[in-house]
């Protein structure tokens, strides 16, 4: 995770130049405790976009019994759905938002040094087939 103090924000004072988006990645695919599919995503004030690529990629912590899942996307409009109950990814009204978030997601992914999967043929195939 990117490390910056959140103290000013907690007091209701957002510092100038504060980042507008947060990138995260969950490597472990179907590991024993959480049973969560491997994914990465972006969170802004208004939206959360998640790409469940669902492949263990041989990562430590992934279940040795994990199988690959069909990749899928989720988009939540946090202004209307703070509990993240309605996936808006296939809603055409959000097409432009999705496109912009995907571009921003790749920039943040790279900026944070998360580029290991660029050397993984499996992940390259997933990105080619399911990202855009």
Protein language model annotation of sequence segments:
Residues 68-70, 80, 88-132:
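Long, internal low-complexity/basic segments
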Residues 1-74, 127-132:
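C-terminal cap/loop subdomain of S1 sulfatases and analogous C-terminal strand-loop tails that border
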Residues 53-54, 87-89:
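Short clusters of small/polar residues that mark proteolytic maturation junctions
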């Amino acid at each position: 995770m990117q490390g910056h103090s959140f103290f000013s924000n907690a007091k209701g004072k957002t510092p100038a130049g504060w980042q507008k988006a947060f990138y995260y990645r969950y490597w472990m695919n179907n590991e024993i405790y959480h049973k969560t599919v491997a994914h990465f995503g972006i969170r802004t004030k208004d939206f959360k976009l998640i790409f469940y690529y669902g492949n263990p990629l041989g990562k430590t912590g992934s279940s040795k019994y994990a199988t690959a899942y069909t990749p899928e996307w989720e988009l939540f409009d946090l202004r209307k759905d703070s509990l993240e109950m309605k996936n808006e990814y296939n809603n055409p009204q959000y097409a432009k938002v999705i496109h912009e978030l995907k571009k921003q997601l790749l920039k943040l992914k790279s900026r944070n040094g998360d580029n290991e999967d660029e050397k993984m043929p499996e992940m390259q195939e997933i990105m080619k087939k399911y990202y855009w």
